[in-house]
Curated annotation (Swiss-Prot):
Transmembrane segments: none annotated. It is found in: Cytoplasm. A motif ('HIGH' region) lies at residues 43-51. This is Lysine--tRNA ligase. Belongs to the class-I aminoacyl-tRNA synthetase family. It comes from Halobacterium salinarum (strain ATCC 700922 / JCM 11081 / NRC-1). It holds the Pfam family tRNA-synt_1f. A motif ('KMSKS' region) lies at residues 308-312. Signal peptide: none annotated. Gene3D superfamilies: 1.10.10.350, 1.10.10.770, HUPs (3.40.50.620). GO terms for molecular function: ATP binding; lysine-tRNA ligase activity; tRNA binding. It comes from the Archaea. NCBIfam families: lysS_arch. It catalyses: tRNA(Lys) + L-lysine + ATP = L-lysyl-tRNA(Lys) + AMP + diphosphate.
Amino acid sequence: MHPDDDPYADDGSGRLFWADAAADRVLDGDPEEPIVIKGGISPSGVPHLGNMNEIMRGYFVAAVLRERGHEVRQVFTSDDRDPLRGLPRKLADLDGEVVALGDVNAGALGQNLGAPYTEIPDPFGCCDSYGAHFSNLIQSSADRLGVDVEMVSNTETYANGGFEEVTRYLLEHVTAARDVLGEYQDKVDEEYVPFNPICEACGKVTETVTDVDADAGTVEYVCTDMDAGDQTIEGCGHEGTATLREGKLPWRFEWPAQWRTLGVDYEPFGKDHAEGSWPSGTDISRNVLGDEPPTPMVYEWFTLDGEPFSSSAGHVILVQDVLALLELPVVRYFFSKDPRRARDFSIEHLDQLVDEFDRMERVYFGEAADASEDERERAARVYPLLVDDIDADRVRIPFTFAAVLGMTEDSALREEIARREGHIPADADADTVADALTRVERAREWARRTNNEFNYRLARAEIPAHDFDDATAAALDELAAFLDDEDPDGEALQGEIYEAAKRHDIDIGAFFAAGYRLFFDEDQGPKLGPFLAKLDREFVVTRLRREG
């Protein structure tokens, strides 16, 4: 492998932020303007957060290059002329609702195995094709993340002749193409042709070319069977002629063809490509096409709740679902981390991710006295790339505290509690308060989705039905009197709940259950003392006395 093509060469040494090191390597190649940053995907199942890896890595490198005064074009190719080789178990509609294959027109897919994605009817009936449906979801996800990326359809590029020149060149130099591919792939014999026509009779992609007329720009073919994993997609046997716009290049040739056609200067990709099609692609690019490959960057895949994303199986989370849980800058923060390290996107522990972002924000604004020099330098470099506008007056309510506020639907009470606990400054204006409280609904959704200790609703409107024995009623009255006379913090109130139960010889668990019944209409709930200490005193005392 040429030393410039090592995808692991960019170790980020000497740079606080990996995107700066990546931009350095891109500029070392003296690229023409605009600098082209690319990613790509083949349609499959449900587009999810993991599919945003290349888009978001490219976003940061593009931002750094623009900071340095360069014009950048960020593109994302949909390999939508690929043939459908199997049926996904899950799909997503344009609203991001994930459904089983049986809930839509499954026949649209099942009857078109072997056909290009853009020739398959949309199972939802809303887009021009299944390929277009998938691309629309990717574009929508990028838009939600605030990334200005241009979707490029391979089908359209073939149809408008964008790949015609490079395809013709490969067919004219087929011996060299075979020799290079044979270093990476078995079954490359003297009859191999790097072009897969689309059968004019059945519409399937076929791999059997019987004759080439490069001058005329046509191939002769036979529609034969296609191996697709553990199944065989039958060809129809038709013999026909196809132009170079009526088929596709095999992937190992299509990738370097994209680099040439789009003028790609930089492309991040997963380690599966780094150890597979990247070495062959650079070899084809340099030694068959005579091109300089783009600057590479390999990234580690991240998992979802400890397990690999699976689009077809539905183990995914969509971008719109993530943004119902997290503010956009927090999502960008996740992707700003070192791409060479494997990570887990843990929904259960999203509070930790938010806390990390909040910490960086405080460090940036000089509000973390214990910050190290490295922390301060990294925050100064990265934070401005995470937010759309830098606002020193912005208020962030701690995520788990926001989840506590989410236990009540009363917006005025949410603000009152947040102010009382010091999470909203006394001089905050209405817009600042409203912005700060948007985190509450996200934290509430996190609690609901994970069913954690914050997934409760305060029964404030009216007292829930209850039936307490005399000892429990007396202990509750005693607790109300304690609150009338004292001003305890959460832990002191928690301790008094224990003591009241003991004084009246009540089972501790049963007494807490009585409190949960009064305040949540549940038998269990959050840590009761700290929660009640955050509420207005009059309401808590009245409820403990069962008066409203």
